[in-house]
Amino acid sequence: MFIRKATSTDAFLAVDLGDVPGHGVVRLAPRILQGGAKDLARSVTYALASLERRETGVSAGVNATPDGRDAAIAAFADEVAGWDAGYRLTAGKGVFPGELGTLEDPTDAALLASGAVAAGLAACPDAGTAVVDGTAGAALVEELTAHGLSLVEADDPLTATADLLFVGARMGAIDHVAADRLQARVVVPTGPLPITTRAVAHCRRNGVLALPDFVTTAGPLMGEAEAARDMVSAIIGDVVGHRDGPLLGACERAEAFLAGWLADLPFGRPMAA
C-alpha cells in the first residue's frame, strides 16, 4: 500500500498494489483521511481477487472546500489521467457523475443490487423477508421485489426481525454493540466495510451470518447483471459454511488467488476497525 500525491491540487490516491491497473472510488471533502482511503482500496483489492483479476484496489481523496471543488476535481482528473496507470474510478462522496473524464467508471446501482440480493439468497435460500437501511435505492428495492422478498418497514433496521439485512450507510455502521442487537439472520453489505472486526466475531457467536462486503458489492465490476448474480452466488456458496464464517472464508479465498502472483500478501484484511 502506498500513497501517491497529486501535484496539481491537494489530492492523493491510495494504491494497494503497484504496477497493475486498478479500480476504486474518488471522494471529495475539505479533508479526506488517508487511513479511510487505504481501507477502501484494500476492500477493492479483495473484490478483484475474488473475481480472479490481477488488479489493485485504489481510493482517491480530493481535499477541497465548496468554493474550490470544481477546479480541484478537474485538476485531479486531468493529472491522474496523465499518469497512464490504468486506473478506473467511480464518483463517491462529494463527487458528481461525469466529473472524472476518461478515468470514470459509471456507478451502476442495478448491478450492485443484483449482486447483493444474489449474495443474500445464496446464504439464505429460504429467505422471505428483507430490511434495508436508509441508503437503499430504487434498484435494490426492485431487485428484492423481483425475487419475491417482502420488505419489512422499521424505524431501526438494525433491530428489525427479518431474514436479510441490507446495510451500507457508512464504514463501521455495525460495531460489536450493534451486532448484539441484530435480529436478522444474514447481514448483506451494500457499501464498503460496514461491519467492524469485533462485530464479525459477535455475529458468529450470535449465529448471524455476516457476508463479505467485497463480494456482495462486486456486481459493478462485472458489467452485466446475470454474470454478477452467478458469480456472487457461487462465491458465497463456496464460503458460507466456512468454519470461521463467510467473511473470513472469503478473505482466505481471495488470498489464495493473490498468493499465486504476489511475492507477499498485503498486510491486513478488509474490515473496519
What are these regions (language model features)?
Residues 1-108:
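N-terminal ligand-binding/catalytic initiation module
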Residues 107-166:
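Glycine-rich phosphate/diphosphate-binding loop of Rossmann-like nucleotide-binding domains
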